[in-house]
Amino acid sequence: AEINLVRRRVNNLEEEVTRIKKDNLYLVNELNKARSDLDQETLNRIDFQNQLQTLLEEIDFMRRVHDQEITELQAMAARDTTPENREYFKNELSSAIRDIRAEYDQICNINRTDMESWYKLKVQEIQTQSTRQNLEQGYAKEEVKRLRVQLSELRGKLADLEGRNSLLEKQTQELNYQLEDDQRSYEAALNDRDAQIRKMREECQALMMELQMLLDTKQTLDAEIAIYRKMLEGEENRAGLRQLVEQVVKTHSLTEIGETESIRVLKGETASRTSFQRSAKGNVSIQDAASDGKYILSENTHRSKEEPIGEWRLKRKIDGKREIVYTFPTNFVLKPGKSVKIWARGQGVYSPPDQLVFDAEDSFGIGSNVQTILFNKEGEERASHIQRSSHTIN
């Protein structure tokens, strides 16, 4: 802001110098005009002097003519012998001569007075104008000198301010570089933190899955124990042998976390009965399909053979109505003894080849009768996972 103010002042001073130069040029032109007028008046004075000389010569000539006429008249009067006539003509001639001389003297005096007055007036006007122009020119020179000094000071100050501005700009640039470095460091730290968080979440998810598998195993074992106990007690018929692979999960109506108990159900509780049936025609099987629709887990059970399952399709049908289809990426290979989890959109992290994400759906669907079937590229069924659930209230 201070630099802009100084620049504006410099511009104003330069405009003032330009204006004063214009005024000085105008005054110089006026002085030259006055000098030209003086020269013209001098020429006029010389012309008038010449005219005066001509008039004086004419007067002298007329005087000589008149003198000659007077001489002739005197001669004529001298020839007149009458004293009265001579005296009369002499008196008349003297009177005429006086009148003529008085008239010419008056004319000469008037012309001389007029010429002297006119020339004095013109000379005084020229002197006054010249003095005024000299004063104005002197003032303009002093003003130009003062403005030059002020302009020099402002230029020096402007140079100092520009130096300071350059230094500040350099410091600003260095600070910007430092800020960019700090931002990159901060982003790198954030990325590291996010990577650690993702890793911890994945580990937590793996632990949760392992815990869920243990709970499922425990529930299955508890159910089998309960079935055997009932069979031993005679409370179940022999058809119960088909339920060895069934999972019995009892859930209180006010509790979100499932609890595993025996098949006995108390009054006022909700019992949920879920059975799973899995089959596979080869090494690739559907190991698990989340009942909440979050993921589907496929596994290569062979310990040494890779299974190329690129473009294979997982078809999931919910309650015989809605159908969801997921296609594996082209050239996807499932390693021996490895599994791949396909997450619904927003439910897990994309980390191939162990974890994939189905971007088309945010859930694989929830229902009481859910069939998940794996087809190869030729449309042949290679594996299936069937889930059936029933709920009773006592």
UniProtKB/Swiss-Prot annotation:
Residue ranges for the region (Tail) are: 240-394
Q: Which GO terms describe its biological process?
A: heterochromatin formation; nuclear envelope organization; nuclear migration; nuclear pore localization; protein localization to nuclear envelope
* Region named Coil 1B: 1-73
InterPro entries with a match to the protein in the record = IF_conserved, IF_rod_dom, Lamin_tail_dom, Lamin_tail_dom_sf
Query: What domain of life does the native source organism fall in?
Result: Eukaryota
For this UniProt entry, the molecular function terms from Gene Ontology, in alphabetical order, are: structural constituent of cytoskeleton
Q: Name one Pfam family in it.
A: Filament
Report if keyword Coiled coil is assigned. yes
In this protein, which residues make up the domain named IF rod?
1-239
| Renumbered residue ranges of the record's region Linker 12 | 74-91
Query: Annotated region Coil 2: where?
Result: 92-239
For this protein, the record's Gene3D superfamilies field holds: 1.20.5.170, Lamin Tail domain, Single helix bin, Vasodilator-stimulated phosphoprotein
The record's SMART domains line, in alphabetical order, gives: Filament
| Residues in LTD domain copies | 272-389
What keywords sit in the KW lines?
Coiled coil, Intermediate filament
User: What does UniProt give as GO cellular component?
Assistant: intermediate filament; nuclear envelope; nuclear lamina
Belongs to which family? Belongs to the intermediate filament family.
What is the recorded name of this protein? Answer: Muscle cell intermediate filament protein AV71
